[in-house]
Amino acid sequence: MPAVERNAPFTKTFIRKPGQRNDTSIPLHTEAPPPLRQPTRIARAKTLTRPERSQPQVPLINPSSGGPGFSAASRSKHRFSWWTAFSLFVTFWAPSPLLSSCCGLKDKQSRQAWREKVSLVFIAILLGGFIGFITMGLNAALCPSASSHSPNTYSRIGTGGAILGVHGWAFDIAQAHHLPEAPALFSLSTSRPGSDISSLFARSTSDQSPACRGTTAAYAADASCVALNGTLLKDCPLGPLSPATFAQYGMYNQTRKIGYGWEDVESANFSNFLVLDGVVLNMSPYLKANPSPIAADVVDLAIRQQLATSPHRGRDATITFYTNPTTRNAIKCLTQKYVAGYIDKITPGCFISNLVLYCSLVVILAIVLIRFFMAVWFAWFMAGRMSSPPRPSRRRRLAPNVLPEGAMISLNSSGAAPWANKQRPPPSQPARRRRDSAQSATPSVPDSLSVHHIGDEPYVVCLVTAYSENEEGISTTLTSLSETHYSDQRKLLFVVADGMVTGSGESMSTPDVCVSLLEADPRFGTPIPMSFVSIASGKKEHNMAMVYAGHYTRATGRRTPMVVVVKCGAPEEAADSKPGNRGKRDSQMILMNFFQRVTYNDRMTPLDYDLFRKVHTLMGVTPDFFELCLMVDADTMVYPKSMKTLTNCMMRDPMIMGACGETRIANKTQSWVTMIQVYEYFISHHQAKAFESVFGGVTCLPGCFSMYRIKARKQTDDDWVPIIVKPEVTREYSQSVVTTLHQKNLLLLGEDRFLTTTLLRTFPNRKMVFCPEARCKTEVPHTFKMLLSQRRRWINSTIHNLMELVLVRDLCGTFCFSMQFVVFMDLLGTAVLPISIALTYTLVVTYCLNPPHSFTEAIPLMLLVAVIGMPALLILLATRKVVYVLWMLIYLLALPVWNFVLPVYSFWHFDDFSWGETRKVEGEAKQTGHGDEGGSATGNAVPLRRWEDWERSRLRKKKREEKRRRELERQFGSGFHNDNASDGDPDRKEAGMPLSRPGSDSFSDSVTVSDFDDDKWGNQIGGYDETLPPPVQIVRHSVWIGDQEVIIDTEDMEKMLETGWDDKAFRARNLSSASSTNALLQAQQPQYPSAVNRNRLSQMGAFATKRDAPAVPEIPARYSMYVQNNGGGRPANGHGNSNGHYEPGSYEMERTPSPGEYASLIRGGAPSPCSPGFGPAQPYGHSSAVSGGAGQYSTGSHARQRSGGANAAYNQPHQHPPQPSQPPQPPQPAQPTRPGGAPAAPPRGAGSQGSGFAGARPSNPTGRGRSYHDRFS
């Protein structure tokens, strides 16, 4: 072959140049030989912690989305096809027509779920049968007692006392009497127990050795007696060998055989003993009777040769006798006539049986002991250090009232959200100009907030999911969270009401309860339903929710930011029994999806954007500052130190991604059902979770009280690692299409455990821990029916989650010394619970009737004592709470319930995916799952846009509304168009007059916007203006009447609410003091209503300020305008029509219905919501939370404030003009109301103050709202 030039064109190489990485190789023209690639270096150091060792996990629910590297289709087909085939094989006796006609399983999925349930029960029965056979039947099968040479039947030679052997059986002579040669026999039984004294009895061939009949050989005919000293006796001293003789002398047969070891047979004390087929023969009588060899006797020759030549072989003559036919025929006669005992041996069957028992003893005891000692270690050395405050660091705490750099909502130079650090290529010049027009006050690109700014108190969001809980339970939970030892500026209460539902026996719906506990922030106006993608299939994929924002003030001395998300459902499901209800997992995903989209700057739903605005306004920082999420159920009371303790755990170890505290029972003694749960709750935390926490692998964080890490900082403090918001986690946890029974048990029943399983599969190197210093209390089921329903869900979800967790190969440890093996043992133990308790009671009864006589027999009893006794010892060592020992005794009495009744019921209801009796809803007959729903998918109807796109649309909408307002004021003036200059308002501006409000460059009319492009997003953007500061005071206005003024006290108002608006009684009572009151009011009242309003209100009476009430400063114009800007109600002077114009003369006070009334309006045919901006009348006014919390800001009060000359104070928006007689009043928080408009109870510590209640017409001419008389009478 000819040589080839190295620099020929076809010899160009793409080998990468040495020493340079990430470099694209190019052809090299060189005379030098091509460079070799870098040598491969094998470095195995620390490979157990290298990230590349972790294998990517296949998605559990939807393997087709496994991503690159997976053969998803083949994996899914292989994984589910064999299970389907197995379920069909097991249930071959139940064809589909039979299931459809007899069992009511009409659809294919229900029949398949039933088949899978039967298959799982079949597997559980097989496992239970296997465990039962190992425990009770293995020894009987492999080592039967009839032919067993088990050590259990032996009395070993030389052991025990007062025992002698007769024909191989052990006889007790301790109580013997009248025994010949008694001193010698007692001495022999003491010095060498078990010695053979058969030669002292007269033996009959027909009775003792029937195999020797008809044989004349010397070995068969010999019947001589030999004394203890070896001399041949003429007569046998003990008489015939019979039961009568034993009874005469008081010798007791122990029914145990005399056992010899090989070392005993080889010793000098047994020189004339040999072994034949496992039987020890005492040949001393034969040799004494025949001292010389017998000629032509083959058997005699074999005996003498074996005794003389094979002492080192233990004198085993079995092979010698089986090689000759004559000696083989003599074996049976010899073993019957000269037997002295048996070789203490074990058969192969007995060996295998004992090996299995010993292995089970070692494994189970090892697990029990390791769990015990690890739990004690955790309680003594780890728990306190884990929950202690983090080490002093260089963190510089950020002042809560200082907005950090980058927290302001703005568009940065790259066009992305301010918290997104990823730089993009520079956009085109036109796009830059459009973006610059939407820039706000902070256009610079903010740096990410470092760990030194946040300090040791990270931002925590407290997720409270509510479904059918009552007001007391929800209020207790929120109060406990608010009163925790954690700054209100660093925690946010995030309440999600799962649908428009009312709990069983409750008079108020759950959303109304949640909203009534909120002191709404008036800046947000009336919430409107926002769309989002829910966890459901079909038509229920599209859902809507309203976001109420404000503060929780029921806690003593606290004012905690709070957000209430009410899932109200789409308009088309308003007629359903539970509009908006999608389950607890969907409520959790609202928060998880929100923070995921914030973290990744991903596209947001309208609900996400609304949440972003309100959370940012309440907290003063953008939501990306939140690092931790505390998930609490709505019936849980958190201890004051718990949140801080869990936060300390997270801050001390950045590898912790989840932590839970101890859950205690609040209603311990309510019933016997609650009493049997006390110890079960205690031991599940302080033993199971404590042991798992040592290795950082807690397999279940309870949903009632757990903290998760939203994202973790990298060690370099320059980037984040998403944890609970990682796409792999949220995608797995938000699956809505589930088809198999296994998937439905994972997602529909045990969402809390499944979330833990998903996190462990995704982050096997991170930790899940238990923090015993963090505690909470919750109410457990108090009836057996409720307990049965709850444990059915828990047991079934536990089995299916452990089935997935046992396949995770990256958990700590290896083989039997790994968390994977512990998970497997937990799975096996859960599956065999029914057979375990049955075997336990069988074992107890058996040992009571027949106590164990050996160590092997006592092995099952030792396991039982260890399993039951170790937790009791753990109580004393770890917690030193002796009272739990008493609770343990109650628990042991209920073991049949825990280990038999509940598991059997759960196994047979594998295909029941409802919540049963745990959460009952008023008027609901039977619960169903949230997953399947007919109809086409509606999730595509939800718009998804990036934050910057939503923000541009909001700013443009705000400019359009400001432009429209300015146009209206040019036409009608700054007042109202039905007022005139003679109404007494000195600050009134006529139509066309210049405005008293200063101009704003940001709202310039010259700004060009695309109305068509942005108007379509108007319904998805709230019409409020969160940039306004909150009102500093509740303003109470007096209302003037044309001729006479009346003073209304608080008691009079309460009577009015009860009896209606017939005020003749107290009008007459207060008439005498009217004149003096007029003078006082005229001196104190700086503002007065217009003439039109005064004439309008004089028809029904009104309120005046109390005689001794201090003067109220006027409200700044910028505060009084928020109702119009928000579009929170009808125009102040009347109702709007379809053209956007106002109809004067019809004054009406109106509020927005509460969440419960919103569903009723939709059912009644109310129009769907239109743009919430200033303009035509909206079907949504102020909510019940807003109307009560800021009643003075309702439409009517806004009208009086505007006509009272509030514009005069616009130039001084942050200052109130001093009053001549009274000093300015301090700020007062808004008072919440209960849904329906009734005033709520004031917060703790709040006194009864004068109300800012305003009057309204008793009639309702339009029918679109309700008067106060209609609402409160």
Curated annotation (Swiss-Prot):
> Which SUPFAM superfamilies does the annotation name?
Nucleotide-diphospho-sugar transferases (SSF53448)
Instruction: Using the UniProt annotation, give all residue ranges assigned to the region (Disordered).
Output: 1-69, 416-451, 966-1009, 1126-1273
The UniProt record lists the EC number as 2.4.1.16
State whether keyword Transmembrane helix applies.
yes
Biological process according to GO: cell wall organization; chitin biosynthetic process
User: Which EC class is the enzyme in?
Assistant: transferase
Record-annotated membrane-spanning stretches:
80-100, 118-138, 361-381, 821-841, 858-878, 882-902
Q: What induces it?
A: Expression is down-regulated in the mycelium and shows a maximal expression in the log phase at about 14-18 h of incubation. Shows a late increase in transcription at the stationary phase in both yeast and mycelial cells. Highly expressed during the stage of white tumors of plant infection.
| Catalytic activity, reaction form | [(1->4)-N-acetyl-beta-D-glucosaminyl](n) + UDP-N-acetyl-alpha-D-glucosamine = [(1->4)-N-acetyl-beta-D-glucosaminyl](n+1) + UDP + H(+)
Q: Which family does it belong to?
A: Belongs to the chitin synthase family. Class IV subfamily.
Identification of the protein by name: Chitin synthase 7
Q: Which organism is it from?
A: Mycosarcoma maydis
Q: Which gene encodes it?
A: CHS7
